[in-house]
Curated annotation (Swiss-Prot):
GO biological process, one term: base-excision repair
NCBIfam families to which the protein is assigned, alphabetical: 3mg
Record's keyword annotation contains Membrane: no
InterPro entries on file: Formyl_transferase-like_C_sf, MPG, MPG_sf
Any one GO molecular function term: alkylbase DNA N-glycosylase activity
Top-level lineage group: Bacteria
Protein name: Putative 3-methyladenine DNA glycosylase
Similarity comment text for this entry: Belongs to the DNA glycosylase MPG family.
Enzyme Commission designation: 3.2.2.-
Entry keyword Transmembrane: no
Enzyme superclass (EC): hydrolase
Pfam families in UniProt: Pur_DNA_glyco (PF02245)
Length: 194
């Protein structure tokens, strides 16, 4: 698994790209599931108007962002979807990387069951941040958990591919930060065994 030192880099854009190709692994309720991280978004407080910690805003929900890098920041979006973020950087520097999509690896059958995704297109199983949490069984209970634990961690091994940058999704309110290319997508060649 990646060591805590990996997450302490203060350059959240670098880490959002660097996380691509690593596997996010969960061992929850006796079931192991994992997927290659193929889509991320960087959120850089305090200057990023799309970030929960813009202008050093602190709320009960975003307090994990002010922690030392290497923990999970999981919050509920629209009152129904849990979203998983990797807290990065130094203590009190509120940066996080949203994991937007994974390519299933281990336990795909478990992910299908958790998402009730039988007889549906597999390429849509984990192609959104709420879907990732549901498939990996990540809930608000896992908020602030260390990402160097057996329960939730990111693999050291990395798969390479072509990286594309685009603007982030769903942040029309973020003014001049709306169009910054802080969303990163990894294109893995289909010939590579995932």
């Amino acid at each position: 698994m990646l060591p805590e030192s990996f997450f302490l880099n203060d350059d959240v854009l670098y880490l959002a790209k660097e996380l691509l190709g690593h596997s996010l692994v969960t061992q929850i309720e006796g079931k192991t599931t994992s997927g290659i991280i193929i889509e991320t978004e960087a959120y850089r407080g305090p200057d990023d108007k799309a970030c929960h910690a813009y202008n050093y805003r602190k709320t009960q929900r975003n307090l994990p962002m002010y922690s030392r890098g290497g923990i999970a920041y999981i919050y509920q979006c629209y009152g129904m979807h849990a979203l998983f973020n990797v807290v990065t950087g130094s203590q009190n520097l509120p940066h996080a990387v949203l994991i937007r999509a994974i390519a299933p690896q281990k336990g795909e059958d478990i992910m299908i069951q958790r998402r009730q995704w039988q007889n549906k297109p597999k390429h849509l199983l984990t192609n959104g941040p709420g879907k990732v949490c549901q498939a990996l069984n990540l809930t608000l209970e896992h908020n602030t958990q260390s990402l160097t634990s057996p329960q939730i961690h990111i693999s050291q091994k990395k798969i390479s591919g072509t990286i594309t940058q685009t603007p982030r999704i769903g942040i029309d309110y973020a003014e001049e930060y709306r169009d910054l290319p802080w969303r990163f997508l990894l294109n893995i060649k289909k010939s590579k065994k995932i």
